[in-house]
């Protein structure tokens, strides 16, 4: 799932594209929205997957992840002007926001019923818009570091 997500980011945000922060955030949010299954897997990654697979399988998974990060790094540095030492943290921060929002945005009938019984109205969240705003905020933060 990560490879497809990273490939989509790489294709949509080529070096020298000249996109400003708002455009990068909008494009990235659209890609995140199209790859929500990647973020859903992230919801179980640390607690289930990474604790129940062989070291070899985990190493294969991590290799694909870091190859994707390494491929994106020069592009993101070029486009965003974020220092190399901050790129992995930048990507990871966006990832965990996506994981959290996907967990929040999922339609779970049991949760809906429990909240209905408690007469709690949960606010509607727009995953893409929330991701866009968060990515824009992260870009601004990491650019000034």
Give a label for each model feature.
Residues 4-38, 90-94:
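Hydrophobic alpha-helical connector segments
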Residues 9-16, 46-49, 105, 142-145:
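Secondary-structure edge/capping motif, primarily at the C-terminal ends of alpha-helices
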Residues 29-71:
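Short secondary-structure transition hinges
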Residues 44-47, 90-93, 97:
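Short acidic/histidine-centered micro-motifs embedded in hydrophobic/aromatic stretches
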Residues 49-53, 86, 116-119:
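A short small-residue
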Residues 67-74, 78, 82, 97-145:
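C-terminal peripheral helix-coil segments that are non-catalytic and often amphipathic
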Residues 80-91:
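Membrane-interface starts of transmembrane alpha-helices
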